[in-house]
Amino acid sequence: MSPHNFEFHLPLSPEELLKSGGVNQYVVREVLPVKHLSSQLRAFQSAFRAQGPLAILEHFDTVYSILHHFRSIEPGLKEDTLEFLKKVVSRHSQELSSILDDAALSGSDRSAHLNALKMNCYALIRLLESFENMTSQTSLIDLDIGGKGKRARAKATLGFDWEEERQPVLQLLTQLLQLDIRHLWNHSAIEEEFVSLVTGCCYRLLENPTISHQKNRSTKEAIAHLLGVALVRYNHMLSATVKIIQMLQHFEHLPPVLVTAVSLWATDYGMKSIVGEIVREIGQKCPQELSRDTAGAKGFAAFLTELAERIPAVLMANMCILLDHLDGENYMMRNAVLAAIAEMVLQVLNGDQLEESARETRDQFLDILQAHGHDVNSFVRSRVLQLFARIVQQKALPLTRFQAVVALAVGRLADKSVLVCKNAIQLLASFLANNPFSCKLSDIDLAGPLQKEIQKLQEMRAQRRSAAATAALDPEEEWDAMLPELKSTLQQLLKLPQEEGDHQIADAETAEEVKGRIRQLLAKASYKQAIVLTREATSHFQESEPFSHTEPEENSFLNLLGLIFKGPEASTQDSHGDTDPGLTGSKDSPSVPEPEGSQSNDELVKQEMLVQYLQDAYGFSQKITEAIGIISKMMYENTTTVVQEVIEFFVMVFQFGVPQALFGVRRMLPLIWSKEPGVREAVLNAYRQLYLNPKGDSARAKAQTLIHNLSLLLVDASVGTIQCLEEILCEFVQKDEVKPAVIQLLWERATEKVPSSPLERCSSVMLLGMMARGKPEIVGSNLDALVRVGLDEKSPQDYRLAQQVCLAIANISDRRKPSLGERHPPFRLPQEHRLFERLQDMVTKGFAHPDPLWIPFKEVAVTLTYQLAESPDVLCAQMLQGCAKQVLEKLEKNATEADPKETAPRLPTFLLMNLLSLAGDVALQQLVHLEQAVSGELGRRRVLREEQEHRAKEPKEKTASSETTMEEELGLVGGATADDTEAELIRSICEKELLDGNQVLAAFVPLLLKVCNNPGLYSNPELCAAASLALGKFCMISAPFCDSQLRLLFTMLEKSSLPTVRSNLMVATGDLAIRFPNLVDPWTPHLYARLRDPAQQVRKTAGLVMTHLILKDMVKVKGQVSEMAVLLIDPVPQIAALAKNFFNELSHKGNAIYNLLPDIISRLSDPEGGVEEEPFHTIMKQLLSYITKDKQTESLVEKLCQRFRTARTERQYRDLAYCMSQLPLTERGLQKMLDNFECFGDKLLDESVFSAFLSIVGKLRRGAKPEGKAIIDEFEQKLRACHTRGMDGIEEFETGQGGSQRALSAKKPSAVSRLQPLTSVDSDNDFVTPKPRRTKPGRPQTQQRKKSQRKAKVVFLSDESSEDELSAEMTEEETPKRTTPIRRASGRRHRS
């Protein structure tokens, strides 16, 4: 067929070219075999060199055959074909530029070039698509091969790197389309198929997910330019719009790619109308359809969001089309529209020079954003807060909106969604960082200047009014000037009742005369008198104008005053009753001409602006203060990200000088112990930022600031706070983040080289001690200086400083038990060291003086002695003997001076208290010393000895006598080699020797028991507290002694009238439960009983102790754990938070809460001892929130349904129904309810029960699948039928009752009322002293657990009045005979 006699039609599929079509339509004559393709391609290349691009007309079959066999041919042939076709199209493009300008071009030549153009483009584009398809398939096969390996596989398959070849092909097509090729077609109208061929190739390339990768950026740009040319020159807009909408719905990787392209078209190609078309198509999408098509909605949302970031001004013209989606169900579309609005506020509607229409548009957009801060979807609320944070950060939020948006953020802090809370905190932090008011935001500091400037403004206005009067102001203008202050005065007076005082209107006075007086008072600015007179006139002249028909409200009253002041002619004028009466209200009113010119007006305006600024700043600081109170409660949330945001917020608030920020900075301290590394690091960063980088001109100035700031944290700090701060400083010191200048200055203050107060010295020693934990040499190298600073004899003695010196010195050694195999013995000081000499002297001399600070000092002194001294028991025995000697001397002296009639000598109470307290401390520390230091040293030496024997080396030099003495004394030279032997030895010493009659400690036991057994005789609260705590410490030593005194301990725990004693004993018994679990286990119910103690202090302590014991598996978790559940509704927030934390931790221990729930529900809904209905709901809502597993839910549903059969009261029915309504039910849970319907069907007559089950139906419907709705409908129908007609078996019962519902059961005592008085808590008959537990042969009865490291701080003060009591010990008849021993094997226990 001659080239001039055929026409090439672009096919829809390659097969069409093989079929005969219309007249003169080109048809492929032969598909060449693979073996001939190389030679035919060479022939095509030769023809191209001779004929140019038109050679394709005769050799198209060769190219078609290559495309047909593309998968079968060699990679080299593919690459040669591609390179050749690129050359052909490039040559044709160059020639067409001159051919198209030739006016004399013949029809046959035009037709030949048109056919060649279509053939060349078709062949090149089909070849491009073939390469692309093969690359995509190779990528799918090699998904597991990443990086270079994947790319190498593709290169091996194709013979070259295709990704580098795409861009040149696309650029070649772009150059071709940029020519005016329309002239090749008749009527200069390019056929649609040709445009579709080129653009379709682009869209297919975009469908490849890898197109969004950074490495394909050049390809994306080439595609965008090619499509841009098609849009501009070939009327492709409609097709592009439809295609873009389709691709957004199906390809999630395309939104950013298409945004880049559309932005390019709108800016570089001037095709802004394409944006309108696309937005119109999206805007016309049905919201209901998008709620089902989540993939499409996601694509549209991402596209709109990024498009708004790129070209907000272009998109803004079409925003009205999108606003309907704000009411749609799909939250992603709402988020996208809101994000677009925010971008317009940021980039288009920002600045102070906006026109009025633009300002109105901005305000409308901000209104929309604020409204969606309360959206039903948490993701939308969160997004709004994020958008406002960006607006604030870029200072695009008008000042008038600050209060409203801050209030929105504060309100969202209480949101149920963690994400919303987190973003609310971030928004408030953005407000702080970008606030226009001040770098220091303190409402206390701002209140004074605000009042001062308000007073100044009032004076300026008064001067202005007086000047205006002399200038004969128009009454209307004068009225406007006085209106704000007049209205303010009126508002204050209207709040007060009208006083019945002296009448100001005489009987003969007329209404006109009174009007004149009112006018004069207003002119003199005597507003209060004028208002009082007018109020009286309205009641006196009820029939006279203008006082008749005046309502006692603000607007009517102002109208009346205005009418009196301005005259009757003002009655037809508009009322000013709605004018803003604020201090800045006159800014917008007409200016009153001043005799002195405009300077006075300018000053007044400036003053009004200043007052407005201070008012805004004051309001802002108040909102921030309110937010601080809410955010501080979020510091212990379970979500790490929220906690981190809270910490960052308080860092920022602290830097802005808000007074309440210090509370938050202190409150974050315990988070240093968090198990979450992110939280711990956030706390360290916060303190690093706040304290380690202070401002100052020199290193010393910075050190002074740092020490001052840290000292503020120590003011009134608790023991827990100090421990947390110590951990943080230890971390900083170990990382060398604390400068040497800081440590140097601390020593100078401690040793008084620089002037410092006693408190400053004390805080310096405390800080040195904290740092010594990280680097012991800080204190160890200056030990003598520290002893001299705090322990030298003074008058009076500073026990607070001495206590801190002891604590600091204690940090120079490791307090942990020595590890086995340690080469060097633990660090200890000789007995003769001056430290112990001074400690012994201060303890014995201070013993005879009633100084309350001596008690905590002697406790740390004894602890330090046992920690650092060689043979500390000898030193402490000397302390005890010295103090006891003073007591005996005092007794002898009193005996000689006492009245002969007295039967027994008296002793000052504080001496007996100090003696018992010291004895208790020594007893406990002796136990710790034996179990840690002595036991650890025995083990260390044994391991070293075993290593020597194992290596069969020559014996080392004989150890020092000081190291062998202990083994000789204990009889271990023969070589006990087992841990059990050493533990048995230590246990034997504790049980048989420490409290033996010949030992020092044993001498104090009779005295201690006498004080504890006779609370009526020894009634001093401090003495009782000290004695009870000392008894608890003595009981820790020996199992036999503990067993003999448990009855006395629990009697005091139950019946002591002093909350301090009960609290201390709760701690003591908790420690005993860990050390001697088998002995204490039968008494566990009495431990639980303290959870309902009437004293807040005792309940809190009991909650802490039981939390520790239960979570550490030290006591059996029984149904009595319901007492812990009751603490969830405790009126004291700290106790309720403690209980919540307990259940949070318990929920992590397997199925613990699930197993306990049935018993808890039974106990709390028990008519005899349960809680009221509302508290029950609160408790169960919290506990049931921990049930998240489907199997647990189903099992609980079945159990609760069965409980309906045994429930006795309607209250119990309601409780069970409520519990079921709180469970996260599934279809299987619903099936369980249907299977057990007869258990509760007859209870549905109760309205509350019925409502609870209806709420279950509502929850099930929300997440139900279509196939599950039938069973839900069936369940609801059964519920309604039983509610209205009852079960088949109860119709006669309903008839007998006359259709009336059963009466509600009487209400039970509230949770608070369960805190019974001490006299009625657990009668004596409830006490049972268990018998000693029988143990298995070969296993000692008193097998002990390792004692807890924690030790309660002694508290001796009590606000409770003491009562004379008789013996606190129970009689033998009260002693129970039952035992409930626990079988425990310490070796098998899993410790958490």
Curated annotation (Swiss-Prot):
It comes from the Eukaryota. It holds the Pfam family Cnd1_N. Keywords: Cell cycle, Cell division, Chromosome, Cytoplasm, DNA condensation, Mitosis, Nucleus, Phosphoprotein. Residues 569-602, 945-966, 1293-1392 are annotated as: Disordered. Its main location: nucleus. Residues 1360-1373 have a biased composition (Acidic residues). A motif (Bipartite nuclear localization signal) lies at residues 1332-1353. Residues 945-960 have a biased composition (Basic and acidic residues). Residues 1344-1353 have a biased composition (Basic residues). The modification Phosphoserine is found at S20, S575, S1300, S1305, S1320, S1323, S1358, S1361, S1362, S1367, S1386. Coiled coil: none annotated. Component of the condensin complex, which contains the SMC2 and SMC4 heterodimer, and three non SMC subunits that probably regulate the complex: NCAPH/BRRN1, NCAPD2/CAPD2 and NCAPG. Interacts with histones H1 and H3. This is Condensin complex subunit 1. It comes from Mus musculus (Mouse). The lineage of its organism: Eukaryota, Metazoa, Chordata, Craniata, Vertebrata. The gene is Ncapd2.
